[in-house]
A protein has these predicted regions:
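Phosphate/oxyanion-binding active-site loops and adjacent basic polyanion-contact surfaces
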Residues: 19-23, 120, 198-206
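Asp-based, Mg2+/Mn2+-dependent phosphohydrolase catalytic module
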Residues: 1-2, 125, 129, 139, ...
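Short, acidic loop-to-helix structural element flanking the phosphoryl-transfer center
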Residues: 73-82, 112-138, 144, 148
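Small/polar loops that bind or transfer phosphate-bearing groups
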Residues: 15, 138-139
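Glycine-rich phosphate-binding "P-loop"
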Residues: 104-117, 190-197
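A metal-dependent, Asp-based hydrolase signature
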Residues: 48-112
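Short, surface-exposed acidic
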Residues: 32-47, 92-105, 159-167, 219
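Active-site neighborhood of HAD-like aspartate-dependent phosphohydrolases
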Residues: 1-47, 54-55
Length: 280
């Protein structure tokens, strides 16, 4: 029986908090230069605004056409966007929304993402090696080359040549965040107990990738692994796949509870559990 595994990478196989520190520092350095403020002042604002985001995790998220499509508290990359917006507001800088969005997302995010370090979660090598017998793909919102570089680094640390089979099975820029209300065969949203807003399900670009990788296999044979339920797992769960939430200290309580309670949901913190779930 063909078993398909769709694996997110950043934050799922890596320690997002540790690898994201250079991204965070570089982003704040650029904000200081752009606003003309002292770095110390920017750092103070960042600490204050980050605390606000973490204190009210339901209120902040990745906005797509004015709607939250992913929570912001989950990792330093997502947290930086509302923090940076608050810093620009406080400085009265880049007030135009189009200009601000291009600056924060298309320029500063992309440029500083390249500064990330390579810090893997415990047992990432063992977990990835165990997935070779399956039809395993890495599907990420990031660009392909940085993720391939991380896999090559993990290969060198774990066992050289262990992940050569994965070389051409990395798909980047998956647009998991792009929500469009045009897939009428799917519900528009999920309601998670404990979360006041809806989780938006109709993500056509991500769905087309999942459908292509699935081929003619039933959804029951597809397992999707990610660290953010709303971004990585909500859509495949609705489609009928099994989903694995690789939780961390910043995973929202409502995501943990919903996945743990669902018959096709699997909540883990040890990546070595993935193989057994695929073989269920």
């Amino acid at each position: 029986m063909r078993r398909i595994v769709v694996l997110d990478f950043d934050g799922t196989m890596t320690d997002a908090e540790a690898e994201g520190r250079p991204f965070w520092e570089g982003y704040l350095e650029d904000l200081a230069a752009l606003t003309g403020r002292e770095r110390r002042e920017i750092d103070e604002m960042a600490r204050r605004f980050e605390a606000e985001v973490l204190a009210s995790p339901q209120e902040y998220g990745w906005l797509w056409k004015g709607r939250i499509v992913c929570p912001a508290a989950v990792d330093p990359y997502q947290r930086m966007i509302p923090v940076a917006r608050k810093i620009l507001d406080a400085c009265g800088a880049f007030k135009g929304e189009d200009e601000r969005a291009r600056l924060l997302d298309a320029v500063l995010f992309k440029y500083n993402y390249r500064k990330t370090e390579r810090v893997f979660r415990p047992y990432a090598g063992e977990a990835l090696a165990s997935l070779e017998p399956f039809d395993t793909w890495v599907v990420t919102n990031a660009h392909v080359e940085p993720v391939k570089a991380k896999i090559a680094d993990l290969d060198a640390r774990y066992k050289r040549g262990a992940f050569s089979w994965l070389g051409e099975k990395v798909i980047g820029r998956a647009n998991k965040h792009v929500v469009e209300d045009r897939e009428l065969d799917l519900p528009a949203e999920l309601r998670l107990p404990g979360l006041a807003r809806p989780v938006l399900v109709r993500r056509p670009h991500y769905r087309s990738l999942l459908e292509r990788l699935r081929g003619d296999a039933p959804w029951e044979q597809v397992t999707v692994v990610g660290d953010i339920f709303e971004l990585d797992l909500a859509l495949p769960l609705v489609l009928g796949a099994h989903v694995v939430l690789a939780a961390n200290a910043f995973t929202p309580t409502w995501e943990r509870a919903y996945v743990a309670a669902h018959e096709r949901g699997h909540l883990i913190e040890d990546l070595r559990e993935i193989e057994g779930i695929v073989l269920r």
